[in-house]
Swiss-Prot record:
Its cofactor is Fe cation. NCBIfam families: PRK02260.1-4 (NF002604). It catalyses: S-(5-deoxy-D-ribos-5-yl)-L-homocysteine = (S)-4,5-dihydroxypentane-2,3-dione + L-homocysteine. One of its GO terms (cellular component) is cytosol. Homodimer. One of its GO terms (biological process) is L-methionine salvage from S-adenosylmethionine. This is S-ribosylhomocysteine lyase.
């Protein structure tokens, strides 16, 4: 397979075992700042996906709440394949801490009573949300917290 420019296109999606959180890449800026991009994979690629209303609400909830747990978050974005998210941190390379930040953020999702910015002024598709869908996705991921480090399902 020819090496592609996009890191995830070089990942053999048939070999990974969701759920997991993996370091997808790093980038160093001219002044020495380092961005660490993580793949938060909720669903098994090409086998299952998150339904859009739940995914959309999960995106809003995670993007808003993750910043309460770390001031190093640059961005949190959904994958177009609807199997996960990317989260980027600046100058923060502690993998175990990233797992704890994601865990705390997903617990915030479970405790949410509304979806932030779920209106036509602040959201581009405000009609497509499901708080309950987001909570279901979050709970399923949290239920497998002990597997998040095991990208290839090897038990290591």
């Amino acid at each position: 397979m020819t090496k592609m420019n996009v890191e995830s296109f070089n990942l053999d999606h048939t070999k990974v075992v969701a759920p997991f959180i993996r370091l997808a890449g790093t980038m160093e800026g001219l002044n020495g700042d380092v961005i660490h991009k993580y793949d938060i994979r909720f669903k098994q690629p090409n086998k299952e996906h998150m339904d859009m209303p739940g995914l959309h609400s999960l995106e809003h909830l995670m993007a808003e709440n993750i910043r309460n747990h770390s001031d190093k978050v640059v961005d949190l974005s959904p994958m177009g394949c609807q199997t996960g998210f990317y989260v980027s941190f600046i100058n923060h390379d502690n993998y175990d801490d990233v797992l704890n930040i994601v865990e705390a953020t997903l617990n915030d999702v479970l405790n949410a009573t509304e979806v932030p910015a779920c209106n036509e002024v602040q959201c581009g598709w405000a009609a497509s949300h499901s708080l309950e869908g987001a909570k279901t996705i979050a709970q399923a991921f949290l239920d497998k917290r002990n597997e998040w480090h095991d990208v290839f399902g090897t038990g290591k």
